């Protein structure tokens, strides 16, 4: 299994436009072969002082993929290219972490 944490920060004033495009893309991603989880998340409220927030303009995709081949196919999917084209000028930063389970 492959895990992905993708942290996206919007340029000022662009948060809602990115979220709209991302939300519209989620069903196509979840339908991909090998997609186990694909969740669009934002900071939880009311979690207390132990939480380190990303901030209002940042959201995180939490993903699980069956294997590296499924993740690579996802990255090359036409709907991902269309999503990237819609949001490329709206994003301030994008950091993608790809990880393997450490508890094997």
Give each language-model segment a name.
Residues 1-15, 90-101:
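Amphipathic repeat-derived elements
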Residues 27, 34, 70, 92-96:
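Generic structural signal for secondary-structure transition and capping sites
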Residues 2-9, 41-75:
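Short, well-ordered beta-strand segments in beta-rich or mixed alpha/beta enzyme
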Residues 39-54, 82-104:
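Glycine-rich beta-strand-turn "strand-cap" elements at beta-sheet edges
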Residues 2, 34-36, 57, 92:
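Residue-level signal for beta-strand positions within conserved beta-sheet cores that form or flank
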Residues 14-40, 79-83, 87:
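Short amphipathic alpha-helical segments
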Residues 60, 75-77, 98, 102:
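Catalytic cores of transferase enzymes with a strong primary signal for eukaryotic protein kinases
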């Amino acid at each position: 299994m492959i895990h992905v944490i993708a942290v996206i920060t919007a340029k000022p004033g662009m948060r809602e436009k990115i979220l709209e495009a991302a939300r519209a893309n989620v069903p196509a991603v979840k339908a991909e072969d090998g997609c186990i989880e694909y969740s669009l998340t934002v900071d939880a409220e009311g979690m207390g002082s132990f939480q380190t927030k990303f901030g209002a303009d940042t959201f995180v995709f939490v993903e699980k993929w069956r294997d590296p081949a499924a993740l690579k196919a996802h990255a090359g999917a036409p709907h991902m290219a269309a999503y990237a084209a819609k949001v490329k000028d709206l994003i301030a930063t994008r950091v993608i972490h790809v990880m393997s389970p450490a508890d094997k």
